[in-house]
Amino acid sequence: MASIMIGSISVPIAKTEQCANTQVSNRANIVAPGHMATCPLPLKTHMYYRHESKKLMQSNKSIDILNNFFSTDEMKFRLTRNEMSKLKKGPSGRIVLRKPSKQRVFARIEQDEAARKEEAVFLEGNYDDSITNLARVLPPAVTHNVDVSLRSPFYKRTYKKERKKVAQKQIVQAPLNSLCTRVLKIARNKNIPVEMIGNKKTRHTLTFKRFRGCFVGKVSVAHEEGRMRHTEMSYEQFKWLLKAICQVTHTERIREEDIKPGCSGWVLGTNHTLTKRYSRLPHLVIRGRDDDGIVNALEQVLFYSEVDHSSSQPEVQFFQGWRRIFDKFRPSPDHVCKADHNNEECGELAAIFCQALFPVVKLSCQTCRESLVEVSFEEFKDSLNANFIIHKDEWGSFKEGSQYDNIFKLIKVATQATQNLKLSSEVMKLVQNHTSTHMKQIQDINKALMKGSLVAQDELDLALKQLLEMTQWFKNHMHLTGEEALKMFRNKRSSKAMINPSLLCGNQLDKNGNFVWGERGYHSKRLFKNFFEEVIPSEGYTKYVVRNFPNGTRKLAIGSLIVPLNLDRARTALLGESIEKKPLTSACVSQQNGNYIHSCCCVTMDDGTPMYSELKSPTKRHLVIGASSDPKYIDLPASEAERMYIAKEGYCYLSIFLAMLVNVNENEAKDFTKMIRDVLIPMLGQWPSLMDVATAAYILGVFHPETRCAELPRILVDHATQTMHVIDSYGSLTVGYHVLKAGTVNHLIQFASNDLQSEMKHYRVGGTPTQRIKLEEQLIKGIFKPKLMMQLLHDDPYILLLGMISPTILVHMYRMRHFERGIEIWIKRDHEIGKIFVILEQLTRKVALAEVLVDQLNLISEASPHLLEIMKGCQDNQRAYVPALDLLTIQVEREFSNKELKTNGYPDLQQTLFDMREKNVCKAAAQFMARAKLAGKILCNRAIEAILDFYGKKFNPASKRRKARIFATICSRVFYHDPSTCEEHSRCRRA
C-alpha cells in the first residue's frame, strides 16, 4: 500500500474504491459539535429558475450574434489579414500592425490551403515511394570515385578572425612617501623646481642648492617677495613634505655662522644642531635672525619688523630688477659693446636721469610716488622745470661731452613753458568777437601756440587741421580756380513728399491701406528664388551684418531687429558706425551743357556741405522706397510675407526693379519679371555700373511706360570706393555716405546719357574691384593675345594709355604693332583718339632708344601733359577713361612737384619704387607670355625657320655664324622662343 511521509510519520493512502465505500461515520470530528459550520438548505423557487432561464437565453442569443458577426467573409478576411500582419514601431513609440496587401493575403491563403491538402494526402499514404538513383542523374565522370562538391558559385570561405591582444597597462604600485622621495630625487638631480601646494591658495616653490658639495632644500617664503606674514609656512600642511626633503638632502655641514643673507627658506632636519637649538618643531625653515638667534619660518612671529630677514641683500635685489627691466628695453645692438666706464659712473648717470624725470627722496617710498601721481600734468612739468633750475650747476658739471646734449635739450624743451604771451594776446585781440569760420580757425591755432610744450596732441592735431583748411581756402581765393563755383553749389532735398499714383489708387489698397500686389506678387517669385537669399531668424543675423563688395565692406543694421527693452541700450542702438566723411567735390555733381543736373547730384545742406547719411533702421518683410525724402514701407507679396529675403552679393540693384514692379500693370507683370530674369540680369551681371543700370531701366521703361514715375529705393554714394549702395529694408549701420537725390526712374535714366558729364555714372552698384589694377592686368594679358587686344581697341581704346606705367609695356605693344592697329581703327571714327595712338607710338620709339630706366620715365612724364590735354576733349563713355585720366594727372603733378625739388638740390627718392614696379611689371608680362597659346608659339617658330631657310640658301656655307646671329635677333624680337634651346640655332653653332 502506498504511503506519504509527513516528517517521521508514515500515512497510508487508501485506494479509490476504498475511499468510495468508506462511510462518513468513520471520520474523526476535529471541530466541536457546537462550533461545526452547517450549510443551509437551498430554497430555489419557480421565479429563480425562470430568471436563470432568461439569462441563459440572452447569453445564447449574444453568442449567436457574435458568431454571425465573425462568420461574415469580410470579418474573416480582416482577421486573417491581421493574423498575417507584422508588428512595427510607429511614430511616438507606438506599436502598430504592418498589414499586407489583399493580393498577398489571397496568395498566402492559397499557399496554406495547398499545404494542408498536400499534408492530408501525405498522411493518407498517397505518395511516391520510388527511389531515384543518382547514377542516372549525374554524369559518368562524377559517379566513379570522385568527390562531389555541393558548394554554390557564391561560396566564400570565412577566415578565422584574429583576436588583437591589448597590452595591459603596467601600474607601478608604491607607497606615497616612497613616490614623493623618488620625485624629489629626480628634481634634485636635474635641478627642477617643485611646487608645493597646500590648502586654499597656499603655495611654495622648492629648489635645491649646492652648499659645500651637498644639496640643501630651499623653499620660497613670503618675505622674499616683499610680503610680511606672522607665519610664513604652515607646518601642519607640509610636514610630510619637509620630512621627505630632509631625506634627500644632507645639511650636517651647515653651521650657524653660514647663515647669511640669501639663506632664507633653507630646510634643516630634525637631527640638525640648529633645529634642536632654535626650533620647537621637528624641522627648521630659516627665516632670519632676531635678538635670540635664528627665526623659524614655521613658527609664529608677533613683531615681524624686529626680524632681520635672511633674503638677498638690497643691492643684489636692486640689480636683479635693474638687469631684468634694462635688458627688456635695450635697443638692438649694432656693435660689440665694451666696458669703457666703471660702475660708479654708470650709477651716477642712471641716478641723474632718474631724478630728472622722477624726482623722489627714496624710490622705495610709496608716499614719494603718490605725490607725483596726484599732481596734474602742468604741475608735474613745473616741478621738473624747478628741479632743473635748482640743480643747474650739477647738470653743468655732469655735462662733460656732447653725447648728452640731445638728452638735456629734450628735458629742457619738454619742461619749459611759453614765456612770450604778448604776441599771442595781440592775436587774440584781433580775432575776438568774430564768428566767421576763418577767425575761429585762427583762434584754435593761437591757443595751441600759447600752450607751447604743454599742448596736447588732440589740440595740436586740431590746429594743424585748421591751418590746412585755411591754406586751402587761401589758395582757392588767390588762384580763383573753378572750385569757387562749386562752393556756391546748393542741392537741398525736397521738403515735399513724392507722390506715387499707384500707392494712392484705392483699388490697389486693402482695408488697412496696404498695397495689394495681386498677380505682381506671384510673378515676383522669379526674382526672389533666383537672386535673393532667405534669412532664417532662428539662425541669427550675425552672418548678414557685414555686406561685402570687392572694394570694401558695409555693415547692415539687420542686427537691430533684436530690440532691447532697456532704454539706454535702445538709444545705443540708434548710433551708427561712421566712415571717413568726404567733402563736396566735382565727383558729387553732374553737368550737361554747362548746367547742373540736380537730380543726378548729391544732396547738400543749406551751407553747401554734403548731407551725410544717418542710421537707417531695419524692418522685416518690407520693400522700402523713397530716396532722399521720408521712406515708404510696402509689404512684400503675400506669398513671401512670412519669409525674409536679402539680395545676394552683387545683385542689390534688383531692389530698383522691384520698386518698378509696383507700378507695372498686373496683366504685364509676367513679361516684366521674365524680361528682368532672362535678358537684363545676364547682361548686367554682378556689380554693374550705374550707367548700365540706368540703361536697363530705360529699356524697361520703353516696354512698360508706367514704370517711369516709380519711386526709387534709397541710394547712398560712397566716393571712397566709387560705389552706389542701394539700401533695402535692413537699413545701414554704416553712416557718413553721400545721398543721391534721384527719386524716380526718370531721374535715374538720365545717368544713361553719354552727354552727361558725371563721375558717378561710372560707379558700380554694390561695389567694384580696384579698376586700374584690373585694367592693367587685362592690358598685359591682351598684349600676347591679338583677339583680346582687338576687342579692347574696339570697346575701350583708353586702356592703352595705362601702358604708360611701365616702359616695358609700351615696348611690347609697339613690337606687337598694337598702336598701328589702333590708328587704323580710330583715325576715322574719332580723330582725338587716333591722335593719342600716334603720340604713344612716337613716345615708344624714343623710349626704346633710351637704355636707362630714369631716362625712359622722364620721356613718359614729358609726354603726359600733351596727352592730358587731348584726353579732356574726348568723350568719357568708356570705363578706362577715369583711370587713364587719373594716371596722367598724377604723372603731371608729380613732375611739377619734383621739378622744384630738383632745382633746389633735393634728391628724388622714388627711384627705388620705380625699379620695384618695373620688376613686377616685367614679371607679370613674362607670366602672361608663358600662358600664350601653344599654336601661336609653333606658328612663330615655323615662320622664323622658314625665313632662315630662305635666306640660308643665299648665304655662303662658311658664314653660318651670321645666320645664327640673325636667328637669335629675330627670336629676341618675337619673345616666343629662347634661341639657346632652338634646334636650328644649335645646328648653326655646330656647323
Curated annotation (Swiss-Prot):
Family label: Belongs to the potyviridae P3N-PIPO polyprotein family.
Peptidase C6 domain span: 644-766
Pfam family, one: Peptidase_C6
GO cellular component: host cell plasmodesma
Organism name: Zucchini yellow mosaic virus (strain California) (ZYMV)
Catalytic activity, EC: 3.4.21.-, 3.4.22.45
Chain ranges of the Peptidase S30 domain: 170-310
Motif Involved in interaction with stylet and aphid transmission per record, residues: 362-365
UniProt GO molecular function: cysteine-type endopeptidase activity; serine-type peptidase activity
Motif segment (Involved in virions binding and aphid transmission): 618-620
GO biological process: proteolysis; symbiont-mediated suppression of host innate immune response; transport of virus in host, cell to cell; viral translational frameshifting
Record protein name field: P3N-PIPO polyprotein
Note on domains (UniProt): The N-terminus of helper component proteinase is involved in interaction with stylets. The central part is involved in interaction with virions and the C-terminus is involved in cell-to cell movement of the virus.
Keyword Protease: yes
Keywords per UniProt: Host cell junction, Host-virus interaction, Hydrolase, Inhibition of host innate immune response by virus, Protease, Serine protease, Suppressor of RNA silencing, Transport, Viral immunoevasion, Viral movement protein
Class in the EC hierarchy, top level: hydrolase
Stored PROSITE patterns: HC_PRO_CPD, PV_P1_PRO
Active-site residues, record numbering mapped to chain: 223, 232, 264, 652, 725
Keyword match Hydrolase: yes
